Amino acid sequence: LAGARVYVTVNVVVKWDEMQRVLRLIRRAWILGADAFIIQDWGLMAQVRKTWPEIECHVSTQANIHDTRGVAACKKLGVGRVTLSRELTKEEISTISKLVVELECFGHGALCFCYSGICHMSSMRGDRSANRGACAQPCRLPYELLNSKHEVVSMGGIDRLLCPKDYCTIDDVPDMIEAGVGSLKIEGRMKAPEYVYSVVSSYRQAIDAAEKGVDNQADVAR
């Protein structure tokens, strides 16, 4: 009704006995008007592409695609877009973009300490799998650093040792566009609507300014 595109996230590892139910859900959502599906599980991706080639599929960042070989494999499957790993440099993104596949990169949100899609820390510490959409975020908890004698090392009051600052690329938007990024992913899950509106509006303004070749950082900062 609002004229917005709807991308349905299916970015979890799918168990064998869940596959048929997930396929039915995807088909139903497609009939209802979903524009694309963001998928992590390679078995699910292959099955959707084989059964319904008309359905547009995007590769989730949870698939940990981080080089040209991975993107080439995605291209061979016929995916519409690849969401790259958050850890890549602009130079690496630029190299990957030469494969002529639409690329999406994280623009704003939490930056995991571990690599997306291959982190088992939540499973080991909290019995909740990050690859099943249930990350307990143990990397955001306070920790102590011990030396070889098991003595606590002073970190000057810092105890969030595994918790990087949130990801913010608004100052890098022109460089990301030049590198070949076609879409920016902004974290909005479990965020207040006001927060989502503010962040998305700021990035929209920055993207429009970059495409026009003007410096709009002062306006964005306000």
Annotate each PLM feature.
Residues 1-12, 17-30, 39, 50-51, ...:
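Surface-exposed amphipathic alpha-helical tracts and adjacent flexible/coil segments at the periphery
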Residues 64:
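Beta/alpha (TIM)-barrel catalytic core signal, keyed to glycine-rich beta->alpha loops juxtaposed to Asp/Glu
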Residues 68-69:
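Conserved nucleotide-cofactor-binding alpha/beta core module
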Residues 43-44:
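Alpha-helix capping/helix-boundary segments
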Residues 61:
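Residues at the C-termini of beta-strands that transition into short coil/loop
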